[in-house]
């Protein structure tokens, strides 16, 4: 519906930035070309139409983008052999970050996304994914910008710095992302949270779920120990 799409557009503007919002509208335009009249109606809404026109010549205004540029630049300058893994929920943001980070001296950045293709957003084949992971492992690529496909399944090499462009509501997914830091030495994990946006709610929800999960695991372990003690004393 128009309301749902407008909510998504505003959410992207607040948590991701102008470029991601434009990417969302470009995908909607592709859907409209395939005959989705509802999508065409949404794009024709005056405020949406005017935003697309005015935002095309605007640089990225969201502070997250500059924060990533600063952190990556500092990390690479301090240690050129470092590995950095950046997670984001959206392919629009993957493309935007690659474009921004490519201008930094010493940064060899590439993307790591899923295999599905949506509109102009083509996915990666499994062969391409495996080749990209090997490039990251060897150092040919030292900054990898990934969607959720980098969380599990494939053997993603460990990183010295993991940046989460936005928090994720799932405690398990958050733990999996943090688990991508280097195991043999200290790694750093940072999550970018835009104030007064959905980011803050998602971050709090994930923290509560994670605490609850660990509490449940502790209860289970305690019950197992009680049963073990009972059998031992019989």
Region roles according to the model:
Residues 83-87, 93-148:
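Conserved helicase ATPase core of P-loop NTP-dependent helicases/translocases
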Residues 45, 88, 113, 191-193:
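Short beta-strand/turn micro-motifs composed of small residues
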Residues 137, 176-213, 221:
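Conserved segment of the helicase C-terminal RecA-like domain
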Residues 1-103:
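Helicase motor interdomain insertion/brace
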Residues 114-119, 141-142, 148-184, 194-196:
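Conserved RecA-like helicase motor core of SF1/SF2 enzymes
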Residues 76-80, 103, 134-139, 155-156, ...:
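Conserved catalytic network of the ASCE P-loop NTPase/AAA+ motor domain
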Residues 95, 99, 152, 172, ...:
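Alpha-helical elements of the RecA-like P-loop NTPase motor core of helicases
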Residues 1, 221-234:
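Long, largely alpha-helical accessory region at the distal end of helicase-like NTP-driven motors
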